[in-house]
């Protein structure tokens, strides 16, 4: 699921919040709401099966939540020598075994079973823009501000730099086994590539900077979207376009993306509070909701950091307002 780098892009998005608020979607209210960060969150990620979420809060470090029981499992602090939490990106591995959390300069990997940190790594030369974690924490994928993407095998230390991009990276993702990666950049291109060889598999061109990318965990689809009005679902086996999302807004930017387990639906979240459900086959928007905003912001707003399918009838979201919310699809 893609969502992790949105804090790095917020400045350019807030300009549009008040305009987008006028285009109100279905006014459905959440079935349930839980507070996971009292004064708001910097980042959040929900596991693909919607049983766990990791939240980076403004004053209380990093928390891992059991979403089935709304129970706090662990509270972590990446910056041991600082009272400020600076974690701006996070990812839960597809097998729910580990969590990666990242600031601009460093990242940590945590065990879900024990709550202990496996290690702490610093990133040199350029800031972290986005990060993804493979199953069993075998490898990590790091998108950087200088346009490079780095794949690191955490077991062997092997490091591969992908140098295909010309400008800063905005989003990265990889398959659960860590073998195939996707990266999107300000150079208007999304690349799908092999993490063993660095070989480009597919190149997806866009008319503006690519702000969001994602891979279906089952290896069926890729997703790429830009900063204006182009969002595509691609066949990961052939590289051919399956559909383009259909929307009427002049601009629609996404902060998170998730494919449904059966491969028929796409779930997106946006910096405008909007959560949307799409039919992959047609590109049509089926339904949309708005997450609860923070009331102390003007205009009252919230960024949807993560969204996931709980089952065929419900979805769950985490947002910058600090709330996890459960929504009914049908």
Task: Specify the residue positions occupied by each region the protein language model found.
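WD40-repeat beta-propeller superdomains and closely related acidic/aromatic-rich repeat-like regions
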Residues: 2-10, 16-330
């Amino acid at each position: 699921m893609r969502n992790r780098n949105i804090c790095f892009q917020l400045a350019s998005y807030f300009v549009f919040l008040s305009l987008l608020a006028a285009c109100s979607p279905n006014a459905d209210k959440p079935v349930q709401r839980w507070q996971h960060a009292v004064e708001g969150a910097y980042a959040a990620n929900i596991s693909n099966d919607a049983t766990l979420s990791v939240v980076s809060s403004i004053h209380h470090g990093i928390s891992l939540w059991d979403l089935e029981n709304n129970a706090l499992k662990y509270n972590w602090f990446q910056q041991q020598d600082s009272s400020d939490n600076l974690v701006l990106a996070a990812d839960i591995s597809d097998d729910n075994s580990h969590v990666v959390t990242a600031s601009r300069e460093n990242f940590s990997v945590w065990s879900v079973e024990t709550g202990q940190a496996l290690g702490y790594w610093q990133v040199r030369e350029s800031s972290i823009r986005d990060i993804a974690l493979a199953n069993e924490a075998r490898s990590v994928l790091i998108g950087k501000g200088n346009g490079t993407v780095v794949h690191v095998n955490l077991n062997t230390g092997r490091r591969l730099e992908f140098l295909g991009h010309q400008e800063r990276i905005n989003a990265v993702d990889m398959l659960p086994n860590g073998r195939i990666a996707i990266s999107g950049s300000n150079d208007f291109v999304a690349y799908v590539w092999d993490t063993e060889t660095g070989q480009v598999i597919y190149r997806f061109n866009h008319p503006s900077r690519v702000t969001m990318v994602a891979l279906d965990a089952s290896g069926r689809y890729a997703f790429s979207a830009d900063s204006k009005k182009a969002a595509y679902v691609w066949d990961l086996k052939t590289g051919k376009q399956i559909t383009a999302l259909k929307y009427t807004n002049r601009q629609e930017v996404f902060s998170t993306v998730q494919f449904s387990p059966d491969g028929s639906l796409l779930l997106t979240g946006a910096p405008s509070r909007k959560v949307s459900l799409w039919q992959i086959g047609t590109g049509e928007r089926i339904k949309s909701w708005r997450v609860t905003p923070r009331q102390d912001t003007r205009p009252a707003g919230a960024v949807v950091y993560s969204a996931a399918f709980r089952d065929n009838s419900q979805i769950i979201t985490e947002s910058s307002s600090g709330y996890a919310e459960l929504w009914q699809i049908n």
